[in-house]
Amino acid sequence: MNIQALLSEKVRQAMIAAGAPADCEPQVRQSAKVQFGDYQANGMMAVAKKLGMAPRQLAEQVLTHLDLNGIASKVEIAGPGFINIFLDPAFLAEHVQQALASDRLGVATPEKQTIVVDYSAPNVAKEMHVGHLRSTIIGDAAVRTLEFLGHKVIRANHVGDWGTQFGMLIAWLEKQQQENAGEMELADLEGFYRDAKKHYDEDEEFAERARNYVVKLQSGDEYFREMWRKLVDITMTQNQITYDRLNVTLTRDDVMGESLYNPMLPGIVADLKAKGLAVESEGATVVFLDEFKNKEGEPMGVIIQKKDGGYLYTTTDIACAKYRYETLHADRVLYYIDSRQHQHLMQAWAIVRKAGYVPESVPLEHHMFGMMLGKDGKPFKTRAGGTVKLADLLDEALERARRLVAEKNPDMPADGLEKLANAVGIGAVKYADLSKNRTTDYIFDWDNMLAFEGNTAPYMQYAYTRVLSVFRKAEIDEEQLAAAPVIIREDREAQLAARLLQFEETLTVVAREGTPHVMCAYLYDLAGLFSGFYEHCPILSAENEEVRNSRLKLAQLTAKTLKLGLDTLGIETVERM
């Protein structure tokens, strides 16, 4: 149930009846304060100006045409022309009942789209580090939300599995006679990478061999392809362990590495030349873009093929966008890549559009994100100044959570404690990131993220168990409760019910904007409203069974909404804490 969409359409029709143009925007928003009702229509200002009327005068005319019978108990004009809408308790009660009767909590299914989501993208032969965390978990929250809404989502893990480094690695593996490459762990491989790089930089004969191996690999030589596949397999096997620990939905089947697009690159360069978009410049093949200017104010040149015949990331990204539209039949493509790549993507997509590879009707969206910083406000590093491995970060999260939950549950059996510590520790790391607006940098702080108060995973997980405890104490007859009506008489009941029914609106924003922090803020607010409701509206000691059952149903929908909301974020819930 999307109340905002329902009210927007009703207000829009009333505005048109009052003389507003057909494309008018009612600007219906959830009210910021209780005294302004549940929703507020703010669109009168802009429209009244066009009509040469006072906004309040237009609002009065709109009210004469606005039929919210059975939806609102009160509609009033406030200030210069805002329309405040107070939802009818009977309307709220009816839709709470409907939400409880549905597995989807009454959330409608929009028109189905095929949506490609590009996220995570680690490099082969390197261990995942904290820099991969944001793309992986923000992208996964978007995927879960879109799939819940009913879209066909194609996960695209654009791993860095191609390039000159592979000649270097294969040459070094061969030199070390590493026949057991498939059994190596990634930690070994990282050491190999460092040693290979050192030799590549210092030993010209080795470097020449590595360069030859790249050519052989790129020409499809089976021995070199097999060695390359081993490196990819070792990497992705190790990465899958991290994905599983993080409770993200990526699998080996979602790998669509850079190598996938290699066969397309010569054809793309030839096609861009044929279309007059690419030209030769100082031996390289370049596309000049009027939309981007260099320091001299001239169109910026984007190289798509180097003088030596090699291709660039831009060429791969052009091929990638083309493939996602032509082969995967994407209606929409989302890229969870950090903000530093923005200009690079915009240039690649400008070429894609000019070449006609992806029509304007298919959005290519860069859902960029900021950096994860240490308490000193600088990029998050180890004490020695090195890159923090993601596996080490998760180990520390688990260790800290173990201490925390053991302190609070001294009598819990070891296996239960481990399961709880895992849910709390991993949940804390993910939620601390997801609860921040992705476009900003954020400070990584263990104490804050593991706190049991504030907008944190432990608080949300605890809030969920608190609602469940009401049911354990109530010893409910499920069938009897299902048949009981919902009655809303108290203000706190109405506020909780209205917020519960805003779940679909929240999902819609997350799906549209790729902003999981909006879901975190909604769930945190919901938990706070439930807390106030629980305190002021006795459930188990209610004045009669009818009120008790009605309040139990509000509690039941709260539990289901918290669980489902946290699930769209990839945060595990627990039954007891």
Swiss-Prot record:
Class of this enzyme: ligase
E.C. no: 6.1.1.19
SUPFAM superfamilies in alphabetical order: Anticodon-binding domain of a subclass of class I aminoacyl-tRNA synthetases, Arginyl-tRNA synthetase (ArgRS), N-terminal 'additional' domain, Nucleotidylyl transferase
Protein biosynthesis among keywords: yes
UniProt GO cellular component terms: cytoplasm
GO molecular function annotation: arginine-tRNA ligase activity; ATP binding
Xref: InterPro entries: aa-tRNA-synth_I_CS (IPR001412), Arg-tRNA-ligase (IPR001278), Arg-tRNA-synth_N (IPR005148), Arg-tRNA-synth_N_sf (IPR036695), ArgRS_core (IPR035684), DALR_anticod-bd (IPR008909), Rossmann-like_a/b/a_fold (IPR014729), tRNAsynth_Ia_anticodon-bd (IPR009080)
Motif placement: 'HIGH' region: 122-132
Enzymatic reactions: tRNA(Arg) + L-arginine + ATP = L-arginyl-tRNA(Arg) + AMP + diphosphate
Top-level taxon of origin: Bacteria
GO BP terms: arginyl-tRNA aminoacylation
Localization: Cytoplasm
Keywords: Aminoacyl-tRNA synthetase, ATP-binding, Cytoplasm, Ligase, Nucleotide-binding, Protein biosynthesis
HAMAP family documented for this protein: Arg_tRNA_synth
Subunit structure: Monomer.
Family: Belongs to the class-I aminoacyl-tRNA synthetase family.
Protein name: Arginine--tRNA ligase
Gene from which this protein is expressed: argS
